Curated annotation (Swiss-Prot):
It comes from Pyrococcus horikoshii (strain ATCC 700860 / DSM 12428 / JCM 9974 / NBRC 100139 / OT-3). ATPase which is responsible for recognizing, binding, unfolding and translocation of substrate proteins into the archaeal 20S proteasome core particle. Is essential for opening the gate of the 20S proteasome via an interaction with its C-terminus, thereby allowing substrate entry and access to the site of proteolysis. Thus, the C-termini of the proteasomal ATPase function like a 'key in a lock' to induce gate opening and therefore regulate proteolysis. Transmembrane segments: none annotated. The lineage of its organism: Archaea, Methanobacteriati, Methanobacteriota, Thermococci, Thermococcales. GO terms for molecular function: ATP binding; ATP hydrolysis activity. This is Proteasome-activating nucleotidase. Keywords: ATP-binding, Chaperone, Coiled coil, Cytoplasm, Nucleotide-binding, Proteasome. GO terms for cellular component: cytoplasm; proteasome-activating nucleotidase complex. Consists of three main regions, an N-terminal coiled-coil domain that may assist in substrate recognition, an interdomain involved in PAN hexamerization, and a C-terminal ATPase domain of the AAA type. Residues 397-399 are annotated as: Docks into pockets in the proteasome alpha-ring to cause gate opening. Belongs to the AAA ATPase family. GO terms for biological process: proteasomal protein catabolic process; protein unfolding. Homohexamer. The hexameric complex has a two-ring architecture resembling a top hat that caps the 20S proteasome core at one or both ends. Upon ATP-binding, the C-terminus of PAN interacts with the alpha-rings of the proteasome core by binding to the intersubunit pockets. CDD domains: RecA-like_PAN_like. It comes from the Archaea.
Length: 399
């Protein structure tokens, strides 16, 4: 039996260590190879994407046109805007079911073939009506309108959140609500709170924004407004100051009034016409319900007419509590303030709270006293009464 010398033992130990080092190095290199292969695949995908993007950018622009008539599976009559009509081929990848008269399409420059279906064009004004940022008003910020809020939520919010309740009962949910009452009583505020609470598209428009100079422009805006609402359903449309376009129609009218009447008739057709409206709810607000056209007020268009009156004593007290909850009050009797502000609107009460705070700031105080509120009541309501007296006397003098 041979015995290894000391040098041989040392060499064998170095050899084993070297083998271990090589194995570890091989594993490291294999890991690097896998990482490089993954990077290569990623870069190849990026290269393919960039080549595809370059190919799309190199494509010549297409003409925009409108389908006039679909002849068969492969051909259609199209019209370039304000230009001649062409009988063209339809690309095989186009969904024939979506091609209808009036559909906007992209046409190839050389062959005029239909190569793409374009979305419906909309006036930028209509797109601007959509409310992107939700108002920060909640139901808790509204005082004295519990009954009105309940009726509004039942008609608009409940069908959007729990449509199954109406299906079980076997009734159709209300389609529209009209809020009417004196100025400053919270009609727009209720709509803002509803927009904050519901998970639906909210479109706000003032009635006067739908009035246009040229014939048919206002009616077109109304049509595009409801088309946008249908596309983004569930949707709530809030029309503020609807009396601007919803006044009673007269026999003798000027050119401008006839255009307003055309806009109103388009609104009537959109709200309850031949085509179904879908999951689109309409809320309108006005200070003048007496001048609205009767066709606008019938069920099917506005199923609920909600009066938003001047607040009573309890309502005024609730409104004062809402507007003073962040104020530092010292010795203030809100019940007494509510009693002496009979006939005041919610806007008046907010102005009173603001003026009371201004009186405190004027005297370099961080708290508000009863005396501040008394002076604020006299300033806000006293000025209003004087202004009304001046207007009345002016009408008496000048007719």
């Amino acid at each position: 039996m041979s015995v290894m010398s000391g040098d041989e033992v040392q060499f064998q130990g170095d050899y084993d260590d070297y083998i271990t080092y090589l194995k570890r190095r091989i594993r490291q290199l294999e890991l690097q190879v896998r990482m490089l292969e993954a990077d290569k695949e990623r870069l190849e995908r990026e290269l393919s994407r960039l080549r595809s993007e370059m190919s799309r950018l190199r494509q010549p622009p297409a003409f925009a046109g409108t389908v006039i008539e679909v002849l068969d599976e492969d051909r259609a009559i199209v019209q370039n805007y304000n230009g001649p009509r062409f009988v063209v081929r339809i690309a095989p990848w186009i969904d024939r079911k979506k091609l209808r008269p009036g559909t906007r399409v992209a046409l190839d420059q050389r062959t005029m073939a239909v190569v793409e279906i374009l979305p419906t064009s909309k006036d930028p004004t209509v797109l601007g009506f959509e409310v992107i940022e939700r108002p920060n008003v909640t139901y808790n910020d509204i005082g004295g309108l519990k009954k009105q809020l309940q009726e509004l939520r039942e008609a608009i919010e409940l069908p959007l959140k729990h449509p199954e309740l109406f299906e079980e009962v076997g009734i159709d949910p209300p389609k529209g609500v009209l809020l009417y009452g004196p100025p400053g009583c919270g009609k727009t505020l209720m709509a803002k709170a509803l927009a904050h609470e519901v998970n639906a598209t909210f479109i706000r428009v003032v009635g006067s924004e739908l009035v246009r100079k040229y014939i048919g422009e206002g009616a077109r805006l109304v049509h595009e407004l409801f088309e946008l609402a249908k596309e983004k359903a569930p949707t709530i449309i809030f029309i503020d100051e609807i009396d601007a376009i919803g006044a009673k129609r007269m026999d003798e009218t000027t050119g401008g009034e006839r255009e307003v009447n055309r806009t109103l008739m388009q609104l009537l057709a959109e709200m309850d016409g031949f085509d179904p409206r879908g999951n689109v709810k309409v809320i309108a607000a006005t200070n003048r319900p007496d001048i609205l056209d009767p066709a606008l007020l019938r069920p099917g268009r506005f199923d609920r007419l909600i009066e938003v009156p001047l607040p009573d004593f309890e309502g005024r007290l609730e409104i004062l509590k809402v507007h003073t909850r962040r104020m530092k009050l010292k010795g203030v009797d809100l019940r007494a303030i509510a009693e002496m502000t009979e006939g005041a609107s919610g806007a008046d009460l907010k102005a009173i709270a603001t003026e009371a705070g201004m009186f405190a700031i004027r005297e370099r105080r961080t708290y508000v006293t009863q005396e501040d509120f008394l002076k604020a009541v006299d300033k806000v309501l006293g000025n209003e009464r004087k202004l009304l007296q001046q207007i009345t006397s002016h009408e008496v003098i000048y007719g």
